[in-house]
Amino acid sequence: MGESESAKWLVLDGYEDEPAAFGVPPYVGFHIRYLCGVLEQHNIDYRYMTIDQWRAFVLAKGEDGVSNLMNSLDGFACVAGAVVPGKYLRGTPISIKETKDIVRKLPLGIPAILGGWAIRGWRQQGWTPLRKNLFLALQDTDATLDNFLKTAKWKHCRRTPEQWSNWAKLGASSKAVKFHPDLWSKDNPGPLTYEVEVYQGCVRYKRGCKFCIEP
């Protein structure tokens, strides 16, 4: 089983490791599933890749392979959220160096959205890539993408409870699950653990974790 090589959008799972989310295999994060749920709702063909799959793709296909893939795209979306200290036994979250390199390789003009706590942190540290039609989402990446697909305009948006429920359901059977490297081959039959989001924010941010991201 494999994904379509002619998919119109590329969804890159940079892994989301934050105080309330693991996001690194054998877990699949909720925000990346919501994002895929948006594309499912709009009936947009897309290809899902983890950052580890992307690294393997670059090594296997080289610059020509990367260029061919990028030039076939109509859009790009990435979630990056590694903001807590820790060591990883399997997957490694995307770095800002890798993110910059990927952005440079994107065709000029195609819509691209980057979201997640790492993106917000990098932006606060001064990262403001100058590229047409690239948007750094500071609120809900999924809702921001949904608004763009409806209006062709970038605007920071937050999802409604109804959207939250719908995209969670669509994302549960999206390519973020069906084509996750922990499930998609006989050599990797699972398990794959769904992370579930039941709450946003934290009431203990004033006297909580040292690596708190809420303030």
Give the residues covered by each predicted segment.
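Acidic, low-complexity intrinsically disordered segments
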Residues: 1-215
